[in-house]
């Protein structure tokens, strides 16, 4: 009998509880952090496919993006209270979030590289200096960019960065970078 009981408990452990509806699975996946999603890809081929598929990952990314944009807007609101000269010299700006990624850049020091960051996975990448930034290395005139556009090309799936100088732009046009 003890052997029979042991076999029975093994059977229970091996039972797979199937989630009846893929919509329910997607609703669960949407709320999970990226690290957990990575682990859950080993559960089954079906889960791996659901997590990696466009339909499975886009709601998750959309959810994370919404959450990230909200937190960034809160940071912007808090940053306005820092008005000392020291803080203005170190002013760090950031772009809107795209697929959980956003760019950090200096609004004052053009010699600092632009960084792309994914806070969920703790991934970051320093981008090569844009032409406008390289010009700032050579010129003593300070050329700043007033806007940094960050987006994703829906056809190719590549991320695009547009660096736009403020007027008067001294003949420098906007610059697009892909990565």
Swiss-Prot record:
Cross-referenced Pfam families: F-box (PF00646)
Top-level division of the source organism's lineage: Eukaryota
SUPFAM superfamilies: F-box domain (SSF81383)
Record-linked Gene3D superfamilies: 1.20.1280.50
Residues of the F-box domain: 19-55
Protein name: Probable F-box protein At3g25550
Organism, scientific name: Arabidopsis thaliana (Mouse-ear cress)
